[in-house]
Amino acid sequence: MYVIENPKVPSVYQIEENLKAGVEIEVNGAVLHGNDRDFAIELLSGTNIVLHVKFEFNGEHSIVLNSLINGEWGPQLRHSHFLKRHDPFHVRIYVHEGYYNITVNSDLLVEFDHRFPVVAVQGIGIKGSVDIESIVFKGYEFKTEWKKRHAIVNEAVCEAYDTVTNAPSVVQIEGTQHY
């Protein structure tokens, strides 16, 4: 298990090893605002947003799930959620062979089919009106040193991440690929 504690928002962190079935990522935090602000958790690969999980607080309190592949958004899925201002939350993304399980506070919210190879995921981005306590990575082999590289990538990317439609990617900053 690897834990990033109290990450700055917005932030992008490189995922040092390939996603695969059995891996899970947990994001623990609290909603900062209610009806006027949103937040998103995204799995990133180059300029692609492989998995976009956006919590919206505009009236109907919905979670939008989607992917941005080669500059094109796919069909979005919407589900209602129960979070409100200052609520603590625990979002868990569990990787299966053909889909992700996404839970909020231990309740299964949705299964979302892979639209892009999970082995291509290079990073996780978090942006919006949210306070993050921790990001927890489980199920990896942890053969590489994760911590040293996170500070480098985060400083290079986090300032621009929340200000552009397509976040700068880890591969653009680092010049490496994870395939």
Swiss-Prot record:
Keyword flag Coiled coil: no
UniProt keywords, alphabetically: Lectin
Galectin domain boundaries: 11-138
Alphabetized CDD domains for the sequence: GLECT
UniProt-listed SUPFAM superfamilies = Concanavalin A-like lectins/glucanases
Which GO molecular function terms does the record list?
Answer: carbohydrate binding; galactoside binding
Q: What is this protein called?
A: Probable galaptin lec-7
Q: Name its species.
A: Caenorhabditis elegans
